[in-house]
């Protein structure tokens, strides 16, 4: 159980960077990835939620109830934005500390990834070369058929389709063959990488003290994050109180109005 937190942290910090070995891009920091994902996700929820609220208020029932949900929604999004700004430096510090504490382990894993990449790169290059050759052959076979279609009449469309079908099937079968060959070539290296990662964690378990030290430091960082986040969360709670109270008053007023109309009938 002690290894769970460390495993998740290391996989998050190194695993999502592994793709940059294949793409040769500059990796984002862990905090940048979290921040970008959270921003996109929250903004999407905010925008779609506001659209639903606006649609409801524009409906006959929404106009009759007059709950002013859109005003409350804007207040909520403003409150959440403020809390997100307050938590930004706190979470940034947490990720910086966590990356610092796991730096040596991440370096070892990145070294393993680089070694495996160098071994499998020739197979990837060969696969790409064969794929380009297959595409060129397919284009050469299809080009005359396209010329026939341009010169022919509508009745030749079916004839053209009949000629294209076996070519497409041949292309599909050849592509599957190349993919299967690549899979078989890469399988040993994939197993080797898994074994290396497993060996790293076994060394940590055998070390005992190192694993306990990583766990203790990560737990300490989480506790510090919780303590520093308390003021922002309290601000969030205080900001929600008037919004919820306003919504409660609007609902009670709508119910009261509906009751009066029913009694009048």
Swiss-Prot record:
GO terms for molecular function: cholesterol transfer activity; phosphatidylcholine-sterol O-acyltransferase activator activity; phospholipid binding; protein homodimerization activity. One of its GO terms (cellular component) is very-low-density lipoprotein particle. It comes from the Eukaryota. Residues 67-265 are annotated as: 10 X approximate tandem repeats. The keyword Glycoprotein applies. InterPro entries: ApoA_E, Apolipoprotein_A1/A4/E. Glycosylated. One of its GO terms (biological process) is phospholipid efflux. Sequence repeats lie at residues 67-88, 89-110, 111-121, 122-142, 144-165, 166-187, 188-209, 210-230, 231-241, 242-265. It holds the Pfam family Apolipoprotein. Its main location: secreted. Major protein of plasma HDL, also found in chylomicrons. It is found in: Secreted. Residues 1-18 form the signal peptide. Belongs to the apolipoprotein A1/A4/E family. Participates in the reverse transport of cholesterol from tissues to the liver for excretion by promoting cholesterol efflux from tissues and by acting as a cofactor for the lecithin cholesterol acyltransferase (LCAT). As part of the SPAP complex, activates spermatozoa motility. Homodimer. Interacts with APOA1BP and CLU. Component of a sperm activating protein complex (SPAP), consisting of APOA1, an immunoglobulin heavy chain, an immunoglobulin light chain and albumin. Interacts with NDRG1. Interacts with SCGB3A2. Interacts with NAXE and YJEFN3. This is Apolipoprotein A-I. It comes from Tursiops truncatus. The lineage of its organism: Eukaryota, Metazoa, Chordata, Craniata, Vertebrata.
């Amino acid at each position: 159980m002690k290894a769970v937190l460390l495993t998740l942290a290391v996989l998050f910090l190194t695993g999502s960077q592994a793709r940059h070995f294949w793409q040769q891009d500059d990796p984002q920091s862990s905090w940048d990835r979290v921040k970008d994902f959270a921003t996109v996700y929250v903004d999407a929820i905010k925008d779609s939620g506001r659209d639903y609220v606006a649609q409801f208020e524009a409906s006959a029932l929404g106009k009759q109830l007059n709950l002013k949900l859109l005003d409350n929604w804007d207040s909520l999004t403003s409150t959440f934005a403020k809390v997100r700004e307050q938590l930004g430096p706190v979470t940034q510090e947490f990720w910086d500390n966590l990356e610092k504490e796991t730096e040596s382990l991440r370096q070892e894993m990145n070294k393993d990834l680089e070694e495996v990449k160098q071994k499998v790169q020739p197979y990837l290059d060969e696969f790409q070369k064969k794929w380009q050759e297959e595409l060129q052959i397919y284009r050469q076979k299809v080009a005359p058929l396209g010329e026939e279609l341009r010169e022919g009449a509508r009745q030749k469309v079916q004839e053209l389709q009949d000629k294209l079908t076996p070519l497409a099937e041949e292309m599909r079968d050849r592509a599957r063959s190349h993919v299967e060959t690549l899979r078989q070539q890469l399988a040993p290296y994939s197993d080797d990488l898994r074994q290396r990662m497993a060996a790293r964690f076994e060394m940590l378990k055998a070390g005992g003290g190192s694993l306990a030290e990583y766990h203790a430091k990560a737990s300490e960082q989480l506790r510090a994050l919780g303590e520093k986040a308390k003021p922002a969360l309290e601000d969030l709670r205080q900001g929600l109180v008037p919004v919820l109270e306003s919504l409660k008053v609007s609902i009670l007023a709508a119910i009261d109005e509906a009751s009066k109309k029913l009694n009048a009938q």
